[in-house]
């Protein structure tokens, strides 16, 4: 047997390298067979895009869309040409719906107060609360949702409220048409949503109403407005826009007036006064002239005119627009 002096540096490095390589060889992942589906849906080809017709909600309204998916993952959204709210086109909100699915900051778990919780903890806490709510017939139980457009979800919420008759359901939308609905209730005695027929109009008076801008009906209203302008049918569609700041509607208006928000109500009252043959309220000279001209056009185009009021205006102004 060789002595210690025969154990040179090169041999020592060989033994050290072998000792390091052996544990590293066992760190690899075990061989696994990866398959896209255990039971593949009928008619689906892996890696091939498939389109589905669906509905995207915005502000309580549904917009028809066609969504392309690959292996069940949405990758592209298009407008549904058969749906009156999209007509084959999309807006920025529809495109953002796809991006939101892959947002790294999207919530992945429920929260309890300021801490991240788990779904198991949520289910356990909910089970206890529902048991206590049953004894009180739902008193103290509140459900907060956005505006629901799904018939299935509305039916499920209805079943929940039947089971807990003392529970309360609250609906909140950051941007909604609540003022417009309340205005229609004041004017007609019941809540209604106005759907203007722009394609048949000869005159539009928009008071802080950007119907060509972002909103649930942007695509349909913009398409109808463009088609009406392109039709060589007398009388030519005329658009008045009165607004406190710039908008797409104001940029396309024949007559645009920048007016302080506090004077919009007086302008609508001035139009109504001219139609009634009464003295209008005080307004700046430019606003007074526009109110007089708009009233004359409304009278000349009776039955073919539309008066729109923006969603952020009070219900009283919406009710006055219905009267006009």
Describe every region a protein language model picked out:
Residues 1-280, 285-286, 292:
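N-terminal export/assembly segments and adjacent metallocofactor-ligating motifs
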Residues 140, 303-304:
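Residues that mark the start of a beta-strand
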Residues 290-293, 304:
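Residue-level detector of intrinsically disordered, flexible termini
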Residues 304, 309-323:
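Acidic catalytic cores of enzymes that act on phosphate-bearing nucleotides/polynucleotides
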């Amino acid at each position: 047997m060789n002595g210690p002096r025969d154990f040179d540096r090169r041999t020592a490095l060989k033994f050290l390298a072998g000792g390091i390589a052996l544990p590293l060889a066992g760190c690899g992942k075990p061989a696994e067979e990866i398959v896209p589906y255990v039971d593949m849906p009928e008619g689906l080809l892996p890696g091939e895009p498939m389109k589905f017709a669906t509905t995207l909600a915005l502000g309580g309204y549904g917009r028809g869309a066609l969504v392309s998916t690959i292996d069940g993952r949405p990758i592209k959204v298009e407008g549904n040409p058969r749906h009156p709210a999209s007509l084959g086109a999309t807006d920025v909100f529809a495109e953002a719906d796809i991006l939101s699915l892959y947002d790294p900051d999207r919530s992945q778990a429920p929260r309890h107060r300021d801490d991240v919780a788990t779904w198991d903890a949520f289910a356990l806490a909910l089970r206890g609360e529902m048991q206590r709510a049953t004894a009180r017939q739902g008193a103290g139980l509140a459900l907060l949702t956005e505006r629901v457009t799904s018939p299935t979800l509305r039916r499920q919420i209805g079943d929940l409220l039947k089971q807990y008759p003392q529970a309360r359901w609250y609906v909140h939308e950051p941007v909604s048409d609540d003022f417009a609905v309340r205005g229609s209730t004041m004017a007609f005695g019941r809540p209604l949503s106005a759907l203007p027929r722009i394609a048949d109009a000869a005159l539009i008076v928009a008071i802080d109403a950007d119907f060509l801008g972002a909103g649930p009906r942007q695509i349909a209203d913009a398409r109808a407005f463009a088609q009406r302008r392109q039709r060589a049918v007398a009388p030519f569609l005329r658009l008045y826009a009165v607004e406190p700041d710039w908008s797409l509607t104001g940029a396309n208006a024949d007559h645009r007036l920048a007016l302080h928000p506090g004077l919009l109500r007086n302008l609508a009252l001035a139009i109504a006064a001219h139609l009634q043959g009464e003295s209008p309220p005080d307004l700046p000279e430019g606003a007074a002239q526009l109110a007089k001209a708009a009233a004359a056009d409304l009278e000349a185009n009776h039955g073919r005119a539309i008066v729109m009021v923006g969603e952020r205006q009070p219900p009283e102004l919406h009710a006055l627009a219905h009267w006009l």
